Amino acid sequence: MVEHTRKGRLVVLVGPSAVGKSTVVRCVRERLPELVFSVSATTRAPRPGEVDGRDYRFVTRAEFDAMIEAGELLEWAEIHGGLQRSGTPAAPVREALAAGKNVLLEVDLEGARSVRKVMPEARLVFLAPPSWDELVARLTARGTETPEVIARRLETARIELAACDEFDNVIVNDEVTSACEQLVSLFVSTNSR
């Protein structure tokens, strides 16, 4: 008898700064403990409570450049006008998918576009704020960015929101539990396809 291994499914989550991606992802990971969450490499500094290797792989610009040069990233991008870089190490994603595991990537708009080019089977999901005013309030309430950084992040958010028709699904994060359940249901329905 020949045993067929099911290839895992890749879901790519995108949303503007302060839309609540990390909170929703945390909820999804609690609901789907078998889900593989790709840890992005980033040149930005850790926020309070973030752990290197769990939330992100925090690297210097020189280390990030070396990863690009070695072809180790599935996607990468300059974010917020070059303020930082972020990317997805390719090997862990490809290995998990080949082993039949479902993978969740949390990336920016350009990252999602890059993943779609190299992995067209990926399901792209956009996490949207309930309103522009709510997004602005969430971003300023974090208290972790300067006014200049907030302005750059809001400009990036306008571009991201304008591109939401490029996504397979749009989930409005007006309430974390509801957004989490919608994302979980996409994984469950993706599994049955």
Curated annotation (Swiss-Prot):
It comes from the Bacteria. It catalyses: GMP + ATP = GDP + ADP. Disulfide bonds: none annotated. Its EC number is 2.7.4.8. It is an enzyme of class 2 (transferase). Belongs to the guanylate kinase family. This is Guanylate kinase. It comes from Nocardia farcinica (strain IFM 10152). The lineage of its organism: Bacteria, Bacillati, Actinomycetota, Actinomycetes, Mycobacteriales.
